[in-house]
From Swiss-Prot:
<feature type="active site">
    <location>
        <position position="352"/>
    </location>
</feature>
<comment type="function">
    <text>Transfers a succinyl group from succinyl-CoA to L-homoserine, forming succinyl-L-homoserine.</text>
</comment>
<keyword id="KW-0012">Acyltransferase</keyword>
<keyword id="KW-0028">Amino-acid biosynthesis</keyword>
<feature type="domain" description="AB hydrolase-1">
    <location>
        <begin position="48"/>
        <end position="357"/>
    </location>
</feature>
<keyword id="KW-0486">Methionine biosynthesis</keyword>
<dbReference type="GO" id="GO:0009086">
    <property type="term" value="P:methionine biosynthetic process"/>
</dbReference>
<dbReference type="GO" id="GO:0004414">
    <property type="term" value="F:homoserine O-acetyltransferase activity"/>
</dbReference>
<dbReference type="Pfam" id="PF00561">
    <property type="entry name" value="Abhydrolase_1"/>
</dbReference>
<comment type="subunit">
    <text>Homodimer.</text>
</comment>
<dbReference type="InterPro" id="IPR029058">
    <property type="entry name" value="AB_hydrolase_fold"/>
</dbReference>
<feature type="binding site">
    <location>
        <position position="224"/>
    </location>
    <ligand>
        <name>substrate</name>
    </ligand>
</feature>
<dbReference type="GO" id="GO:0005737">
    <property type="term" value="C:cytoplasm"/>
</dbReference>
<dbReference type="GO" id="GO:0009092">
    <property type="term" value="P:homoserine metabolic process"/>
</dbReference>
<dbReference type="GO" id="GO:0008899">
    <property type="term" value="F:homoserine O-succinyltransferase activity"/>
</dbReference>
<feature type="site" description="Important for acyl-CoA specificity">
    <location>
        <position position="321"/>
    </location>
</feature>
<comment type="similarity">
    <text>Belongs to the AB hydrolase superfamily. MetX family.</text>
</comment>
Length: 379
């Protein structure tokens, strides 16, 4: 399906918002930019718009290529495009880079209008609520009163849930994939270790490393390597690499010997080349802070009591970072609140990263659900 169809060459757009944005922590961004990409056409009724919310290291480039020479397509190209589960022949699809990101939206790499210098570590902490608030401003800009669906995996799924809670009248369907209604203690611990790798890098320079012409590459590399391990399933990792060595025998040293070591270092190096350390810190804290039930006496059922959206919730059998049990919490709360919810647990060997992959059962389920979303657009 995905190999024969594509949205083709796409061009990002930077949307300026000359308005203040008051953040959850009480600070204010005097203005902000959001980098977006759109695919498909908004219909005359403006009721076929789908918002794609990205995970920790994602961005606005969801599908297609920026040029014919690009080696890689967007991060969810197998999901979004003509004839794909989120069909751009039927839906107007919007992808964006969230506030605090490093791919064109306002973030640590942006110029602070009050100082004329890069924000760096001075960019304020942002939360999932803040992202959804900025995304609502984007919807207003695009003339979209209500999303046909808000879709996201992992941290993106948290945004889809928050949309349904914060703006119940503006979301008809929420697709929450490989996500959770809040992070587990273990996940918070993983994030802290990753941040410590960055914060203690001698080249971090209190977050103003660019003004010192340095990059905390070692810390960011280690953070990514550790994070990447948690996105994979143990059995899948074992089948892919086993105990395979890069040479014929042990070297009895600390150089790269096992193939899995080589793979992780490659992933770390690649990440350092495309991502910003301050953004990584911000994104992981947004994950930690997400807990919509906290505003409702720690009751998730009360948190979703006023949602109007219908829900599609998906988890993956070997995802131990966002285990199926975490999706069950959301499903049970929605049922207790008498909301519409469809749930699927996909058997997969790929751990948390399965939400990015082209599993047949997973793709069929999303396709079937999006067919219903399309029918709602035609009522």
């Amino acid at each position: 399906m995905s190999q024969n169809t594509s949205v083709g060459i796409v061009t990002p757009q930077k949307i300026p918002f000359e308005m203040p944005l008051v953040l959850e922590n009480g600070k204010t961004l005097p203005r902000f930019d959001l980098m977006i990409e759109t695919y498909g056409e908004l219909n005359a009724e403006k009721n076929n718009a789908v918002l794609i919310c990205h995970a920790l290291s994602g961005n606005h480039h969801v599908a297609g290529k920026h040029s014919a020479e690009d080696k890689y397509t967007g991060w969810w190209d197998n999901m979004v495009g003509p004839g794909k589960p989120i069909d751009t022949e039927r839906f107007f699809v919007v992808g964006l880079n969230n506030l605090g990101g490093c791919d064109g939206s306002s973030g640590p790499l942006s110029i602070n209008p009050e100082t004329g210098r890069e924000y760096g570590a001075d960019f304020p902490m942002v939360t999932v609520k803040d992202w959804v608030k900025s995304q609502a401003a984007l919807a207003d800009y695009l003339g979209i009163e209500q999303w046909a669906a808000v879709v996201g995996g992992s941290l993106g799924g948290m945004q889809a849930l928050q949309w349904a809670i914060s703006y119940p009248e503006r979301v008809r369907h929420a697709l929450v994939i490989a996500s959770a209604p809040k992070l587990s203690t273990q996940n918070i611990a993983f994030n802290d270790v990753a941040r410590q790798a960055i914060l203690t890098d001698p080249d971090f320079n209190e977050g103003h490393y660019r003004s010192h012409n340095t990059v905390p590459a070692r810390g960011l590399r280690i953070a990514r390597m550790m994070g990447h391990i948690t996105y994979l399933a143990e059995d899948g990792l074992g089948k892919k690499f086993g105990r395979d060595l890069r040479s014929n025998g042990y070297q009895y040293g600390y150089s790269v010997e096992f193939e899995v070591e080589s793979y992780l270092r490659y992933q770390g190096d690649k990440f350092v080349g495309r991502f910003d350390a301050n953004t990584y810190l911000l994104m992981t804290k947004a994950l930690d802070y997400f807990d919509p039930a906290a505003d409702f006496g720690n009751s998730l059922t009360r948190a979703v009591q006023d949602v109007q959206a219908k829900f599609f919730v998906a988890s993956f059998s070997t995802d131990w970072r966002f285990a199926p049990e975490r999706s069950h919490e959301l499903v049970k709360a929605l049922i207790a609140a008498q909301k519409s919810v469809q749930y699927i647990e996909v058997k997969s060997a790929h751990g948390h990263d399965a939400f990015l992959m082209e599993d047949e059962a997973y793709m069929r389920a999303v396709t079937a659900y999006m067919n219903n979303v399309d029918k709602d657009c035609r009522l």
